[in-house]
Curated annotation (Swiss-Prot):
Homohexamer. RNA chaperone that binds small regulatory RNA (sRNAs) and mRNAs to facilitate mRNA translational regulation in response to envelope stress, environmental stress and changes in metabolite concentrations. Also binds with high specificity to tRNAs. One of its GO terms (biological process) is regulation of RNA stability. It holds the Pfam family Hfq. SUPFAM superfamilies: Sm-like ribonucleoproteins (SSF50182). InterPro entries: Hfq, LSM_dom_sf, Sm. This is RNA-binding protein Hfq. Keywords: RNA-binding, Stress response. Belongs to the Hfq family. Residues 11-71 form the Sm domain. GO terms for cellular component: cytosol.
Length: 98
């Protein structure tokens, strides 16, 4: 039996808003508010693009990431609760998530 890749909600959420180019508001722990589109992320940082400029934001400085539109990461018809519903499309081409 093939073992499915382990996913965490942070990576699934960030990958979803990155792929859909959903505008986000990022609140930092010091209260600063940043807005833009997440273009890339890894275990330690996020690239945020706005008005043609890119900012490198370290994850330890982030308090909250709030998308401009609602994000659905799981199938609400499931009774399992907080199970993340991943498709092959969600994982395709994202070596950092496998």
């Amino acid at each position: 039996m093939a073992k499915e890749p382990t996913q965490n909600v942070q990576d699934v959420f960030l990958n979803h808003v990155r792929r859909s180019k959903t505008p986000v508001t990022v609140f930092l722990v010091n209260g600063v508010k940043l807005q833009g589109i997440i273009t890339w992320f890894d275990n330690f940082s996020v690239l945020l693009r706005r008005d043609g400029h890119t900012q490198l934001v370290y994850k330890h400085a982030i308090s909250t990431v709030m998308p401009a539109t609602p994000v659905v990461l799981f199938d609400p018809s499931r009774t399992e609760g907080a199970t993340v519903d991943l498709t092959e499309k969600d994982l395709a081409g994202d070596a950092d998530l496998l």
